[in-house]
Every structure is written in C-alpha cells, then in structure tokens.
Amino acid sequence: MNEPPSSSTPNLTFNCGKCGEALQVPQSLVGTDVSCPKCQQVTVASTAQSPIPQTADANTTAFTDVTANTDENQSLEISTRLELNSVDALSAAETPTKILFNKITTEIGKLFVGQDELVIGTLVALFSSGHVLIESVPGLGKTLFVRTLGRVLGIPFGRIQFTADLMPSDITGAPMFDMKTQEFRFRPGPVFTQLLLADEINRSPAKTHAALLEIMQEFRVTIDGKSHALDRPFLVLATQNPIESEGTYNLPEAQLDRFMFKLMATYPEKDEEANILRLHSEQTDINERLENEVQTVTSVAEILSITQENSKIRVDEKLINYINEIVRKTREWPGFHLGASPRAGIALMQGARTLAAFYGRDYAVPDDVAQISLPTLRHRVILSAEAEVEGIGVDDLLTDLIRSVEVPRL
C-alpha cells in the first residue's frame, strides 16, 4: 500500500456559493462537497481560484484529485487506503447509513483495535452482499473481530476450521436417519449461520471448496436435490496464512472470484499494540466482555434495508467508464498473466456505492473506486512468470495501472 507523501501540498481556496465566505480545504478534497461553517451551505470544492501554498501535515492522507487530467495522474498519489479517519474527513452529511456506520465502528473499537482496512472492507462487503478473503498471519484477532462484529450486528456467528480431511457434508450438513420417525431428516451444517468465519480455507482440497461456491453465490445449500435457503444477511470471511504453504491448496480462480474483497490484516502499529495489551490486561473472560461492554446497535431488518438503499446510490456514466477502463486494463497490463473478470467491475461499482453511503453521499466519485480497487482486484489477477521472478508485487502493479487511467471530471 502507498504511504502518504511527506512533501508539502498546497491548499485550495474558493468561495461559498451562498454567502461568499472564503473556504480553504486541502487539494485532496477537490470535487467533493464542503459545508460552509458560516451559513452551512454545501458547496463543491472548485479549482476556479488558484491554491494558496501552505505546508501540509506529513501525516495527511493523499486522495485522487477528481478533476485531474491524464498528465497530472502520473504525479498524483492515489489513495488505496481504507481508513476510519478518512471517512470522517470526507463526510458530506449525517445520513442514516453514515450514522449507523459510526455506531458499528465505535462498538467494534471497544474490543478490536486498529486494522482499519479489515473493518471498513468487511462492512462495505456486508452492506454490498459480498464476501471477504483475509490474508493474515495467526494471532491478529480475526476470530475476535468476527465475534465482536456478530455481537454489534445482532446476528449469529459460526466458525469452521478447514483441514485436509474436511468433507463437504461437514460444511453444508447431511441427511440423517431418524430412528423414531424411520425417515431421513436434514441436519444443517455450520454454514447455516449469518456470519461465517472459514479459518485457513486453503488447507482443504478443491472438493471441499466446491461446496462453498453455490453458498457464496446463491445463498442456499442444495442437498439431495432439495434447496435450503440461508438467512440474510450472510457474510463469509475466509482466512488464509501467507507464510505456511506446506499442506495447503491453491484456491481455484472460480472461488477467488466469488470474494468481493481480499483484505490484508497486518501487524498493528506500536501504539495500537500497546492498546491491545491494555485491553487484555484485565483478567476478564472475553464472552463476559462481549456481553457487558459491546452493544448491539442494529438489526437484521435495518441491515437489509440499508443494503437495498445503497444500491440506489448514483453512479455517473463517466464513473462507469472509469471502472470499465481499470478492469479492462488488467487484461493487457505488463506483468499480469491473467486479468480481472467483469465480476470485478460489478464489485467495484457496488463497493463504491456503499463507501459513498458511508461518507454520507448519495453519489459515488472516483475516490470511492480508487480506495477499494486493491481489495477488489488483488486476488482476481495473476502475475506473469517474469513479474514473479523479478519480485514485483501485485499491489504495486495495480497501483501503477490505476494511476495510468484518466480520472473523470464529474
């Protein structure tokens, strides 16, 4: 992932469209809605006036200038970060979706520290009816995160530990003969939940992986010709270990494509790790803390309602062409042996809509697409043999690709 630039960046000065008040914002907010502190009028940040140079904080997050031309794209830092503070910085209005998003992240933060990409990416996938693949070393709190998320959302949580001898029926369930009724009765498997943690999914063979394909795409299980619907919302969070390769199986492309995002859980920062130690310094059972400290802030009905509302977020025709151009370039970009499928474009559009709703907007912008591009594409492309030999990373190639695409003026 790109680090924020440490060099100074100019601020942009423009006038409020209602009262004429001079407003000054970072260049990164060009094209976004800004609320005037004097009259509360919402005005689109415009480049009509020249920016006034000012030293920027080295920690300021860089975002794509939505009015940039092709030449300027070469020198811009495109934000591929999903950070909680960026959601607050770019918020346009206090909409019901944004209010709920803030409540959920606040409650999760009571027990789960850091990992902004994991938290935001999972919530975007949940409210887009998608699924998440998490690449992470052991011990970073994935199970705690899923349990906390289930508590906050008020939906049941299930966990499957994938092993080499795990059978499809161990996931989906199977018919069992009932001695009392002398009939076969379907015994549901652990997949019949709403928040499923598929731990170390790459330790099972392809036969077991195939059992998840229908579940993830159709939200149902078919046993002996009879379909059993899963309760909605339904979210699969699958994990794989990037270090240990012995005894693992590569996930087939068909299954990788079913995951909306591939998120990277990394080691926490120094301050975050210190906070983790403080949280666990009290010898209190985790179940007790979940019960007493974390509150349920939503319901199944509200989740489904907001998911439906997010599908109505406006996507301009120029933004559709922008998404299409990014996806199509992955198929011809040097360093990629296999590019992304049309399903990647659908995921980018759906994710951009949901992220825009989290920002409090009723329309999507190129920044929304840029921030979810890496999680959407990194597992859908395959490096060429030459790129692997040279040690070039997927994220590096994708970042260069995204920078090469002209950002539309909306």
Model-predicted regions and their roles:
Residues L123-V124, F177-L197:
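Conserved alpha-helical scaffold flanking the Walker A/P-loop in AAA+ ATPase domains
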Residues T330-L410:
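C-terminal engagement/docking regions of AAA+ P-loop ATPases
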Residues T95-V132, V137:
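Pre-Walker A (pre-P-loop) alpha-helix and adjacent loop at the N terminus of AAA/AAA+ ATPase modules
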Residues T193-Q217, E246-L256, Y267-N275:
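Conserved AAA+/SF3 P-loop NTPase catalytic/coupling segment centered on the Walker-B
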Residues R185-Q194, I223-Q240, L251-M260, M264, ...:
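AAA+/SF3 P-loop NTPase mechanochemical coupling elements
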Residues V152-D178:
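AAA+/P-loop NTPase substrate/partner-engagement loops
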Residues T248-Q308:
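Conserved AAA+ ATPase core "coupling" helix
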Residues F127-F162:
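Walker A/P-loop
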